[in-house]
């Protein structure tokens, strides 16, 4: 009986370590485009036996815990949110905002004392003494800014509907969101190469990591624009980057050509020349639209492409990792969009804010690719 219990316990710990390292769910069962290579690299039996031989079970836990830098922060946030379960500040919804839809600095609103309690509980501001007037004070505005920044809201210190909606989400629901984010972090195959690029889609940021003896070292961080969350979301997958292309042509996907480019050209024939578009059919290239060549695009025997230049949708460079979804990283001429707080604006590809910095990170093994050469 004791031997049977020991075997079952050993098996249960191995399962726990495997789930901790790889995740409980195989992302491929959710139709996410992940390769399974990294899931085979972790052997829970070996890790557990080594820890037992050393008399240190914590060693196994450390070995199984994902090295993804954000994972530790997520675990800390999960513990904090779980500790707030049932907190009195969320016992009731906040009252409706006035017709203006927001509360500005110095204005009064009956819900502000509860807002202050929630922000203090979440660590975004210091606790406010009981009986404090229901006014949007400078201290409360700073707390709102901290909360808004953490939730990808416009950090303006104003209490608007989006901020109220976010504040009304109970800690228990937030804890579930964090737990799901931790599961996704376990899917991230950071140890597969000596350098990794990770796009945090809901955060609208890209990170570049170097892997040194199992340690994950952050090297690059920048804002990105990702796919529209409802219509053309950026899919989750992992692939190997194979090449970088400077001054690229943009081959307009047929879905965009049908829904946007061709209707625009039909309304305004001069649009094609102004934007640097041309129609390619076999060895023929035309810069003038006609019913015949536009129909050829629609039936798949021709394609629209955009010439390199200041108007090119891909900007100065694209970073390619072949995949069946035609998703890649690229620059953009519309750099002002990076100043937005919510940046789900693309058709699925990821637009990067600092293409030169990213190219340096990707091409660093080749000393001929200097910053000056890349910038040209």
Language model feature labels by segment:
Residues 11-15, 34, 38-42, 49-376:
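Well-ordered beta-sheet/strand-loop patches within structured domains
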């Amino acid at each position: 009986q004791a031997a049977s219990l020991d075997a079952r316990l050993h098996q249960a710990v191995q399962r726990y370590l495997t789930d901790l390292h790889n995740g409980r769910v195989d992302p491929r069962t959710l139709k996410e485009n992940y390769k399974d290579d990294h899931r085979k690299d972790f052997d829970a039996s070996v890790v557990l036996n080594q820890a037992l031989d050393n008399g240190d079970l914590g060693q196994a836990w450390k070995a199984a815990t994902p090295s993804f830098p954000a994972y530790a922060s997520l675990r800390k946030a999960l513990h904090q949110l779980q500790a707030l379960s049932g907190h009195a500040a969320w016992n009731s919804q906040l009252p409706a905002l006035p017709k203006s839809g927001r509360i500005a600095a110095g204005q009064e609103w009956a819900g502000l004392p509860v807002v202050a309690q929630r922000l203090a509980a979440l660590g975004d501001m210091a606790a406010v003494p009981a009986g404090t007037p229901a006014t949007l004070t400078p201290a409360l505005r700073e707390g709102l800014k901290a909360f808004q920044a953490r939730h990808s809201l416009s950090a303006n210190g104003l209490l608007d509907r989006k901020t109220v909606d976010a504040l009304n989400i109970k800690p228990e629901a937030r804890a579930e969101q964090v737990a799901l984010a931790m599961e996704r972090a376990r899917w991230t195959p950071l140890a597969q190469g000596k350098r990794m690029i990770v796009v945090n889609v809901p955060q609208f940021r890209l990170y570049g990591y170097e892997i040194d003896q199992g340690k994950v070292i952050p090297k690059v961080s920048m804002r990105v624009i990702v796919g529209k969350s409802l219509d053309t979301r950026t899919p989750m997958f992992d692939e190997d980057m194979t090449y970088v292309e400077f001054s690229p042509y943009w081959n307009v996907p047929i879905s965009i050509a049908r829904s946007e480019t061709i209707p625009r050209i039909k309304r305004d024939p001069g649009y094609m020349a102004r934007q640097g578009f041309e129609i390619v059919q076999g060895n023929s290239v035309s810069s003038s639209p006609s019913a015949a060549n536009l129909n050829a695009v629609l039936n798949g025997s021709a394609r629209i492409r955009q010439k390199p230049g200041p108007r090119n949708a891909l900007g100065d460079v694209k970073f390619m990792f072949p995949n069946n979804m035609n998703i890649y990283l690229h620059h953009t001429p519309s750099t002002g969009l990076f100043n937005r707080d919510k940046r789900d604006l693309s058709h699925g590809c990821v637009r990067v804010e600092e293409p030169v910095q990213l190219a340096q990170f990707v091409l660093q093994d080749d000393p001929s690719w200097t910053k000056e050469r890349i910038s040209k």
